[in-house]
Amino acid sequence: MDIAKRQRLEAAGWTIGTVEEFLGLSSEEIAFIEMKLALSKAIKQNRISQQMTQHELAQKIKSSQSRVAKMEAGDPSTSLDLLIRTLLIFGATRQDIAEVILNSGS
């Protein structure tokens, strides 16, 4: 947000903060969310690069298309286990997954 807009909002009585502050998230919770989102993004990138539909991926991982959509959207109900297993099914190595997680905070 630009400085002028921030000053206008604060002058009008608004409090400016971060999502983390608003939701009261700890640094550990933020890191976990960022890791899951990075894994979700990697799944979508892999699916698209392999020209696969969500339905086709769902069949491959023995799940539903709606579950794949939730995985790609970063839905909090998606387990870390399913995200990692899906990347492994795509042929990702442990090193590949580690790199996704390592770069999740950048």
Regions found by a protein language model. Name each.
Residues 1-38, 98-106:
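N-terminal flexible/basic segments that precede or flank functional cores
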Residues 50-70:
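Short alpha-helical DNA-recognition segment
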Residues 70, 74, 85:
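Alpha-helical DNA-recognition elements
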Residues 12, 41-56, 85:
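Short basic helix-loop element that most often maps to the first helix and adjoining turn
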Residues 48, 62, 73-75, 102:
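Residue-level detection of the helix-turn-helix DNA-binding "recognition helix"
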Residues 38-39, 63:
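Alpha-helix N-cap/N′ positions at the starts of helices
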Residues 62, 79-97:
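DNA major-groove recognition helix of helix-turn-helix/homeodomain DNA-binding modules
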